[in-house]
């Protein structure tokens, strides 16, 4: 018969040379759909996720999801990890959706909304990564503490003012393990016959 006839058909598609699945952690920045939204760079992503010490059954909030690069990396660690990427800007939320689809991640949920208001509608988290707080860091930490007083939280800060504010805010809570780490990353780039280290 022909394929124009009605009936049940079965089709097998084989890829003779599939791309090998990476066994390493860490995706290159170029792997992500970027747009004009700021993105946490590769080396900082890996350190931040390492400091979170996620477990296979973790539930994690990524507050200020941006492009979704951190959310994607966390979700790829295990199918059992549930990641909620929270983003209030529509352009950024759309990028997270596109990156979620690109990497086929069913365990990554994009939450369009502002933290901390939308956090109480989500399943309680065991971990939280704060890449951007929109100026609401004290309120966000208050809600996180109420949701789970033993939640492990990693906060990225670019300015000295934000870093100082974080240590000031943390004094309000009985923090079991407080750690402040300064990370500087430079990448070599060609300038004529020379290579210059450029800050990331």
Walk through the language-model features, giving the residues of each.
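Conserved SAM-binding loop of SAM-dependent methyltransferases across substrates and taxa
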Residues: 67-79
């Amino acid at each position: 018969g022909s394929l124009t006839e009605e009936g049940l058909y079965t089709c097998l598609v084989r890829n003779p040379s599939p791309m090998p699945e990476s066994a390493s952690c860490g995706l290159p920045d170029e792997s992500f759909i970027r747009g004009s939204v700021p993105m946490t760079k590769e080396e900082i992503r890996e350190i931040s996720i390492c400091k979170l010490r996620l477990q296979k059954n973790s539930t994690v909030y990524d507050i200020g999801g941006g492009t979704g690069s951190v959310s994607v990396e966390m979700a790829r660690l295990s199918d059992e990890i549930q990641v909620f990427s929270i983003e209030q800007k529509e352009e950024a939320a759309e990028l997270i959706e596109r990156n979620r689809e690109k990497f086929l991640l069913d365990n990554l949920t994009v939450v369009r909304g502002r933290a901390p208001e939308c956090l109480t509608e989500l399943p309680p988290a065991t971990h939280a990564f704060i890449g951007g707080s929109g100026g609401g860091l004290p309120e966000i930490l208050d809600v996180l503490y109420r949701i789970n007083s033993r939640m492990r939280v990693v906060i990225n800060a670019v300015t000295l003012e934000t870093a100082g504010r974080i240590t000031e805010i943390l004094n309000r809570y009985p923090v079991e393990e407080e750690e402040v780490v300064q990370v500087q990353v430079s990448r070599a780039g060609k300038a004529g016959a020379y290579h210059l280290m450029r800050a990331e």
